[in-house]
Amino acid sequence: NRLCHLQLVTSGLTDAAMFLPDGEVVQPAEALYKRPIILLRGSFDPVMNLHLDMLKQTRTLFQSSLESQQKQETVELCEISMNNLLREGKSGEIDHLAFLDRANALQALGKTVLVSRCPEFHRIATYLSRYTSSPIGIVLSIGLLNELFKEKWSENLAGGILESFGRLFKHEL
């Protein structure tokens, strides 16, 4: 099932595929509807304690600003973008075994996995905001923070980096 849904994302038939910790494929609308979201982007090759520590610290800080009911409903997503998967494969193809290993490792740790076609931060924020009106938190490492300011992510926008940040923060992020 996971490889079939990965192929849907690869083919451009859907923007994202989501896998619950138990391996079940789920529609993002079902899993995210009106729920606060914490998103960690990365390649997760391999999954490291640093990833888990970043999520733990973010969850603590993020949930301190939520109402008690929302704290219980918070969804933690570990997102692997198609850019990461295609970049790491040979000749622009995805290594399906490596993908399954990463997904299995994250799911064994109780994490929900999201595979998306949204390389730009503002696009993933817009995608997630379709499904929730609750707060969305994106966990950034120093490397990703630096990446956020690169022109390549806003070159297709008339307003450049300023428009990119405007789109990113227009949702409750």
Set out the residue ranges of the language-model regions.
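Nucleotidyltransferase catalytic core that binds NTPs
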Residues: 1-173
